[in-house]
């Protein structure tokens, strides 16, 4: 009988504690406190691009003339994802040259990772710009490449011409130096 009482008393105590916890909880799930939202004017500007964009012209190479596009096909789709913390740029959807660029913050810094059709993933960091209509990104490393020799996108300048027109200038490096610049002029699909 003493053994039963000795084992029963802690078990009853445990049940009382468990009942108190359950009664206090009332089955309500509590969300963790919200993290303070860190924002960046550049990321907010990128969020304004959400939607479909049509290629107006392409210029491949500094000496080339811009090639006007008339097919009105969607070339880029911007989407705000991850509770507003990331902007996804989906380039050339449904084509063999399909690519994705993710714009996000790293602390206060605006970054991008470009998932290139070349199979590498350059990262770039936005620099301070005196021109509020431009976001200028510079190479900050990458994966699946040796930047001293492998071809990769190295810099990007996005110019916000107006609410419905942008220009993207992608700088390509090979063998550790600038090789080419491709310029896309885009308009928002209405």
Residue ranges, per PLM feature:
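Bacterial N-terminal signal peptides
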Residues: 10-19
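Bacterial N-terminal signal peptides that target proteins for export
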Residues: 1-11
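Hydrophobic small-molecule pocket/channel-lining residues, especially in calycin-type beta-barrels
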Residues: 24-190
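Short hydrophobic transmembrane-like helices used for membrane targeting/insertion
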Residues: 3, 21-22
């Amino acid at each position: 009988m003493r053994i039963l009482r000795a084992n029963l008393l802690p078990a009853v105590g445990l049940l009382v504690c468990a009942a108190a916890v359950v009664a206090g909880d009332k089955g309500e799930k509590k969300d963790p406190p919200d993290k303070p939202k860190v924002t960046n004017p550049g990321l907010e500007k990128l969020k304004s691009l959400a939607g479909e964009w049509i290629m107006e012209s392409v210029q491949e190479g500094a000496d080339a003339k811009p090639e006007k596009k008339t097919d009105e096909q969607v070339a880029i789709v911007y989407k705000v994802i991850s509770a507003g913390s990331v902007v996804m740029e989906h380039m050339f959807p449904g084509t063999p040259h399909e690519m994705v660029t993710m714009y996000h913050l790293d602390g206060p810094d605006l970054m991008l990772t470009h998932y290139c059709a070349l199979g590498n993933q350059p990262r770039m960091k936005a620099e301070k710009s005196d021109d509020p209509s431009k976001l200028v990104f510079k190479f900050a490393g990458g994966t699946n490449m040796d930047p001293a020799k492998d071809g990769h996108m190295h810099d990007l300048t996005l110019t916000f011409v107006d609410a419905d027109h942008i220009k993207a200038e992608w700088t390509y490096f090979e063998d550790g130096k600038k090789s080419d610049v491709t310029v896309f002029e885009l308009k928002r699909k209405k």
